[in-house]
Amino acid sequence: MRRYETIFISDPDLPEDNRATLFEKMQGLIAEHDGYIAFFDEWGARKLAYEVKKKKRGYYVLMDFCAEGSLIAEMERIMRIDDRILKFLTIQTEEEVDLDAVKEQVAKAKAEKEAAQKAAAEKAEAARLEAEKAAEEEAAKAAEAQAKEAPAAEAPAEEAPAAEAPAEAPAEEPAEEPKSDEEDA
């Protein structure tokens, strides 16, 4: 058994269900010939370097699989006939592979990917909790600052009458002075 990679570009205007049918057809073909799909990666719609069958964009898909050489001829024949596929390329990546070793390698890669996703999720959760804590602290500081400003705003209002009283006192003093002039005369 050999290991292959096939990349094909399908029509980007295909409806999602039609595209899914095409992908299932390719995966089923590999399974029919006792092959094993290591991974099936959809890259999505991308701009093509040049027009292919009057299309400027294509939907890219990468398949990594193990199979016998007879499958490749049949798969390429089907890809040439199918109008939904714009272009394809198949390369052999390994001459002889142990299917159990490939399955183990794929399982290990999946476990590492899941662990990385779990670690990323935990890190995101920790960052979210820290952001919430910082927001709560900021809100508490703002409330505390507002509480300090409120009594300070009330205090000048109480001091204002005291400031008016000295202003009245000098006004009374000149009134007394003329009285003292009359008494002297």
UniProtKB/Swiss-Prot annotation:
- Asked whether the keyword RNA-binding is assigned, the reply is yes
Q: Where is the composition biased (Low complexity)?
A: 142-169
What is a single cellular component term in the Gene Ontology annotation? ribonucleoprotein complex
Task: List the Gene3D superfamilies.
Answer: 3.30.70.60
Database matches in InterPro entries = Ribosomal_bS6, Ribosomal_bS6_sf, Ribosomal_S6_plastid/chlpt, Transl_elong_EF1B/ribsomal_bS6
* Listed Acidic residues bias regions: 170-185
GO molecular function, a single term: structural constituent of ribosome
Locate the compositionally biased regions of type Basic and acidic residues.
115-141
Question: Could you tell me the keywords of this UniProt record?
Answer: Ribonucleoprotein, Ribosomal protein, RNA-binding, rRNA-binding
**What intrachain disulfides are recorded?**
none
Q: Does the keyword Transferase apply?
A: no
What SUPFAM superfamilies has UniProt attached to this entry?
Ribosomal protein S6
- Give the span(s) annotated as Disordered: 115-185
Q: Which Pfam families match?
A: Ribosomal_S6
Domain of life the protein comes from? Bacteria
**What is one GO biological process annotated to this record?**
translation
- Role noted for this protein: Binds together with bS18 to 16S ribosomal RNA.
Q: Which family does it belong to?
A: Belongs to the bacterial ribosomal protein bS6 family.
Under the heading NCBIfam families, the entry gives:
S6
* The name this protein goes by in its record: Small ribosomal subunit protein bS6
Q: Which organism is it from?
A: Desulfatibacillum aliphaticivorans
